[in-house]
Amino acid sequence: MFDVLMYLFETYVQSELDFMVDQDALTDELTRAGFQKPEIYKALSWLEQLAALHDSEDAPEYTACASDSFRIYASEEMLKLSTECRGFLLFLEQIRVLNCDTREIVIERLMELDSPEIELDDLKWVVMMVLFNLPGGENACHQMEELMFEPEAITIQ
């Protein structure tokens, strides 16, 4: 499923090409690209759930966390997210790429992936997808891109 998400993000979203709304045509194109239909359906469902967060009235605004807050991970989350991944999420909060709300969206989207354990690179791409989808997240998305592709260019404020 993650391969389908990456293909869609790189092909349509990140390249700013028009994203097909017709799910059948998109499914056919993804099948021609070599993806299996069950994986395509899972990925499209994952994206629909992410988009629903953007469209809902409960979409988080991009605000800072209270400096004294601390995230306690559930046992299922600890099994799926390594110490490295959890540390990276904390780092993203500390440099204000993520806030409390966006961190929770990222964790929720990571938990919905069908991988038993999340790799750090996969986490980074999910963060990009979430930030790209949220209104007001442009600066954070740009900072995340710099962190991914030009790690020496990131400035901690």
Curated annotation (Swiss-Prot):
This is Protein Smg homolog. It holds the Pfam family DUF494. Belongs to the Smg family. It comes from Tolumonas auensis (strain DSM 9187 / NBRC 110442 / TA 4). Coiled coil: none annotated. It comes from the Bacteria.
